[in-house]
Amino acid sequence: VLRASAAGEAAGVPSSTLVCEGFMGLAAASSIGLGMPNLPVARVVGHPGVQSKEMLERNVLEVTLEAVIDNLLKAPKSTGKGDEPGARDVIAKGGFQEINDYFYDHGLSDGLPIVPPTREKVEAFLRFTDRDPGESLGALLPDSRAATIWSIAVNGVMAGCRPEYMPVLVALIEAMADPAYGVEHSGNTPGGETLIIVNGPVIKQLGFNYTQGVMRDGFRPNTAIGRFWRLYLRNVAGFLPHQNDKATFGNTWRVAIAENEDLLKKIGWEANSADFGFAPGDSTVTIARYTGGNHISSVSGATPESMMPYLYDAVIRQYSWQLMFTVGQGMGTLRPLMLLSPIIAETIAGWGWSRRDLKRRLFEHARIPAREFERILRDWTQKPTWNLAEEARAGRIPKVFHESDDPGRPVPLVWKPEDYMLAVTGDLTRNSVYVFAHNGVLGYPVAKRIRLPRDGEGRIRNG
């Protein structure tokens, strides 16, 4: 809404954005990022979702309306920030503790010790890319800072990455800057956190863990690169708690995971990256934002048919309000992700099933009654009545959502089989799956190729 207000103000049209009082700080910080630190906002007392109709009306008339009128007649005082230091400016000097205290006090760290980004360390990272340090990959909302190669190296140093990780970091920020991903939603209420999936030769070149404990910290590439992602969101995009990051509870950054491509080759399955058009042998990163997840232990059975009920149930139980990204706010943007332990994938593939077959079965059988789907939409959106039949007849959703008028008819969670994402990773001998709850259009899956510099493999070998 603030972006619409900024566009109106830029065109000379007065505006006033209604903002719940818990988001006033976010509005002020976002206005600065939009280049209009005096963007007019009007406070909405409390939260409308927990107020009676009478209380809401009284608060709007007594508080909000007056602010709206003032905003349309005069601009509020500026809340702008001072000038920021240049890319190569020295901002602090001292020992390890002094530097860490400075970065923490100025909101530049995640609360854990950082590696001081000295010029020497930053330049070591730059030797692992052929790109100009001043090149910008795009302006990242909400602060509209340029995502430069230099700033990628700086935050990579701080996160504890090794210099040879630089090509991965660049690919990640290319993905972050992709409009399809929606970085501007990174601080929204559910507090979703991005998961990074790595594919290709770079997995072994850099030593990523892709077996037991794949989502656990303790493996440097997985851990440091996951930490880098959150540091970059803070320091460049501008997502800081109590400011632009308004997650109600939030999540801690996730370690990056890698697929077990040895197992994929053995069973004849394509990698996750193939779903995004990449060829075998391409090193890639895939990002998407998830609000939670659930581990399903002991998926038992000697055949796919005996295993699949566990998988259907796992997907169904993970999704409630997120169905608004299937029908509603996101309209077809829900992308559930399922991690399969190698023994599960190998058993399913052993009966001749492909990844495509597995996705098709999930689409056909992981379903809920239409009346339940409509109830979830009614309860979790502001629209009091939902009718899947009307949506399908109007052509807004696929016809599979209205194959009959039976309110108990099973309907899918997504629009088509290809909407499911699969990755094979984790303990080689455990029969488990993990299902992530996707945040839809507010963190849509994006994949980018990792491009090594000239003689990149040689540089990586030599460290």
Residue ranges and their predicted role:
Residues 1, 17-25, 120, 163-165, ...:
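Gly/Ser/Thr-rich loops at beta-strand to alpha-helix junctions
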Residues 2-28, 38-44:
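Short, acidic/small-residue loops that bind anionic groups at enzyme active sites
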Residues 14-18, 50-59, 211-222, 297:
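Flexible, glycine/proline-enriched loop segments at strand-loop-helix junctions
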Residues 21-25, 49-50, 344-346, 428-430:
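Short Gly/Pro-enriched loop/turn and capping motifs at secondary-structure junctions
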Residues 30-34:
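Short low-complexity, flexible loop/linker segments enriched in glycine and/or proline
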Residues 45-80:
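A charged, well-structured terminal subsegment
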Residues 85-463:
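Non-transmembrane, aqueous-exposed alpha-helical and coiled segments at domain scale
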